[in-house]
A protein has these predicted regions:
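Active-site cores that bind ATP or allylic diphosphates and position pyrophosphate for catalysis
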Residues: 1-88, 94
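Glycine- and acidic
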Residues: 35-44, 88-92, 242-246, 259-266, ...
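Catalytic adenosine-cofactor/nucleotide-binding cores of aminoacyl-tRNA synthetases and other
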Residues: 48-53, 74-215, 285-318
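Residue-level signal for inorganic ion chemistry
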Residues: 56, 102, 280
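Secondary-structure transition/capping motifs at alpha-helix termini
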Residues: 61-68, 271-272, 315-318
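Short coil/turn segments at secondary-structure boundaries
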Residues: 70-73, 108-112, 121-124, 188, ...
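Aromatic-anchored, charged helix-turn/loop surface patch used as a conserved interaction hotspot
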Residues: 199-252
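C-terminal accessory/binding modules appended to enzymatic or scaffolding proteins
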Residues: 229-282
Length: 318
């Protein structure tokens, strides 16, 4: 009848309705009682509760309910692989994530491999944003089975939107690194040259990402950048690259530019070739890794990249 009867510490018997905030069960029986009261048929919870599952189920069944189906997910870890703890303050809150990326990127991150412990820290945000939009772009070309396995189908209840991200989030961070933009309108000058049909009005996801990218860059990338001077081999290769760019007549074709950058590294004897690209990132962007450099040139601009190389070789970035 929705009441609970108990004896208090003085031996008096009380009967109270369980509604209206009169009672609160201890946390272990609360799970099972809630399942029975609300006819819960599916419950997911962290693995720290998994050892108590038989207790929860037993309480639910004792109250006349049917234990729900369970899904137990792994816990999130911090950057160093330690369990996230409120007392340590080593976690990344939802509000913090949403200060640097759209809600859907967080949903995408959480969807991935729920039974695997995932490191959740600020550095994973750009990757989550770009992978989410990759899945959006792939969705229209997929078979029904592939679409049902695509996270965006579940995130958007079968009706995922069309991605209007003409520039990846990671590339926006690199653009912010060299563009000196104070607000997203400064980034849009480069974006529109790269994708003339794009605009803040026609590409709201892109516009939002541009604002997020500037904030993320200023808070996390800029304080950690470390520029260095090039080695003799790198200097010769960068001078060659700048010379080829000065006479470049291939437009803003990212693939053609990437092929040319690749050829410069090969001709200057970089082995493995990864060392050539690492040198470009460290000398020009102050980072140990970065985008496909041809795509970066196409977005930032050929003349602007020549000028950037000149400043780096002159030691002005160090």
């Amino acid at each position: 009848d929705g009441t609970i009867t108990f004896d208090d510490e003085d031996g008096r018997e009380w009967t109270l309705p369980v509604t209206g905030g009169n009672v609160k069960l201890q946390w272990k029986p609360d799970f099972g009682a809630r399942w029975a009261a609300l006819d819960v048929d599916f419950e997911m919870y962290g693995k720290d509760h998994s050892t108590n599952t038989p207790i929860y189920d037993g309480i639910c069944e004792a109250l006349g309910g049917r234990a729900p189906e369970h899904f137990i997910y792994e816990l999130f870890l911090d950057e160093s692989g330690q369990k996230i703890s409120k007392s340590k303050g080593n976690g990344l809150t939802i509000d913090e994530w949403l200060s640097y990326a759209a809600t859907e990127s967080l949903g995408y991150f959480m969807y991935q491999k729920p039974k695997t412990a995932k490191r959740m820290h600020f550095d994973v945000i750009p990757k989550a944003v770009d992978e989410y939009h990759q899945q959006l772009r792939a969705f229209p070309t997929q078979t029904i089975d592939q679409q049902l396995a695509n996270p965006v189908w579940h995130l958007h209840r079968g009706q995922p939107p069309v991605s209007d991200m003409v520039v990846p989030f990671a590339m926006l961070l690199n653009l912010a690194s060299v563009a000196g933009a104070k607000d997203k309108s400064g980034l849009w000058g480069f974006i529109k040259r790269y994708a003339p049909d794009a605009s803040p009005e026609a590409n709201p996801q892109m516009d939002q990402a541009a604002g997020f990218a500037l904030r993320y860059f200023n808070d996390f990338v800029a304080p950690t950048r470390v520029f260095r001077l090039p080695s003799d081999q790198e200097r010769a290769a960068m001078e060659d690259l700048a010379g080829r760019l000065k006479i470049w007549d291939g437009g803003l074709d990212a693939e053609a530019l990437q092929t040319m950058v690749f050829a410069v590294g090969t001709e200057h004897g970089f082995e493995p070739l990864r060392g050539w690209f690492t040198g470009l990132y460290e000398v020009l962007l102050g980072a140990s890794q970065g985008p496909r450099f041809g795509g970066f040139i196409a977005l930032y601009g050929v003349d602007e990249t020549v000028a950037l190389i000149g400043r780096a070789l002159a030691g002005e970035l160090v």
